[in-house]
């Protein structure tokens, strides 16, 4: 199986240098963002077609930051590859000994079809770190449910294009093992600190995982939820379904991230308070994660603690 290698990526990226500059010359420096042990980033695609100019811009920046990219052949194709081909390319890249980290080219839609067919026994043989987002909520939570790899949710490459300096610094801290505290708003408090491991992502995809029975066991976990305006009208339906299925029954806490941001703030606040009243665990809001420039990486294998006043602290170290 052949991939687009480092040299081809550099050449292709230089063709789009003008696009990168026009899009904003003062983009955050990405040097060291993925930690000292990441030299080669594998870039797979299991969902929608990639916006090429945006992809080449971020590729250019990553190469300038010192990373080597291995890009799956379907990333720059103009049509979505077959499910079987997307599956095979992902599995091959996962098992490639040169690849230190997988960061998907984009989210979009279509990941569910690939996730359903993955050879999990094969993937268990390599503890690959994977960063997925949005539609890839389907993959990273399925990894957690299957006990495969090291799942994280955070910006895919086309999302990283518009991540701001604060976001990049926060992601760099996480990937280097020194994430800083984040102060959250308390929607429904607790008498003592809550602690656990994270799970979560885009509400629509968490809802789909629930319906399919693929959602990881949330017992003792802290569930992070974002919701884009595209799905705002279905918020009650999706949360209601997850409530009915008992998703939140034994969770340690729920953290609301970017949520219906273009809806009236008072209406969103009321909706979250109504939701919090229906579940037994504490609920917090205001974590910077979602389809926003000021986003974060959430590491599903890193323990975190939330104090009664809403201070979220991650465990330190690699």
Could you say what each language-model-derived stretch is?
Residues 23-98:
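ATP/NTP phosphate-donor binding region
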Residues 107-125, 141, 269:
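Short Gly/Thr/Asp-enriched flexible loops that form oxyanion-binding sites at enzyme active sites
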Residues 214-268:
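Internal helical hairpin/lid segments
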Residues 71-73, 132, 251-258, 284-286:
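Short internal beta-strands
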Residues 149-211:
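Conserved anion/nucleotide-ligand pocket segment
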Residues 120-142, 150-157, 282:
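Short, acidic/small-residue loops that bind anionic groups at enzyme active sites
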Residues 8-18:
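Bacterial N-terminal signal peptides
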Residues 258-318:
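ATP/nucleoside-binding phosphotransfer catalytic cores, i.e., glycine-rich phosphate-binding loops
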């Amino acid at each position: 199986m052949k991939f687009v290698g480092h040299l081809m990526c550099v050449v292709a990226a230089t063709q789009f240098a003008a696009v990168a500059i026009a899009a904003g010359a003062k983009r955050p420096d990405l040097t060291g963002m993925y930690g000292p042990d990441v030299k080669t980033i594998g870039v797979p695609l299991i969902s929608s077609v990639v916006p090429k100019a945006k992809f080449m811009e971020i590729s250019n920046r990553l190469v300038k930051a010192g990373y080597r990219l291995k890009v799956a052949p379907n990333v720059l194709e103009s049509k979505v590859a077959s499910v079987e081909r997307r599956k095979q390319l992902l599995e091959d890249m996962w098992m490639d000994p040169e690849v230190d980290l997988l960061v998907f080219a984009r989210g979009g839609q279509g990941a569910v079809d690939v996730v359903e067919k993955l050879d999990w026994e094969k993937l268990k043989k390599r503890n690959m770190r994977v960063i997925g987002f949005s539609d890839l909520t389907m993959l990273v939570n399925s990894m957690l449910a299957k006990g495969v790899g090291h799942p994280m949710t955070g910006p895919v490459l086309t999302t990283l294009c518009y991540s701001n300096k604060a976001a990049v610094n926060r992601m760099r801290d996480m990937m280097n093992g020194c994430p800083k505290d984040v102060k959250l708003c308390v929607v429904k408090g607790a008498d003592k600190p809550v602690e656990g491991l994270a799970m979560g992502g885009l509400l629509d995809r968490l809802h789909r995982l629930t319906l399919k029975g693929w959602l990881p066991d949330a017992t003792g976990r802290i569930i992070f939820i974002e919701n884009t305006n595209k799905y705002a009208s279905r918020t009650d339906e999706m949360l209601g379904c997850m409530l009915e299925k008992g998703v939140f029954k034994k969770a340690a806490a729920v953290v609301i991230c970017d949520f219906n941001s273009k809806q009236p703030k008072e209406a969103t606040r009321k909706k979250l308070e109504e939701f919090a009243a229906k579940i037994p665990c504490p609920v917090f809001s205001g974590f910077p994660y979602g389809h926003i420039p000021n986003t974060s990486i959430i590491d599903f294998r890193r323990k975190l603690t939330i104090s009664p006043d809403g201070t979220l602290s991650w465990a330190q170290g690699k």
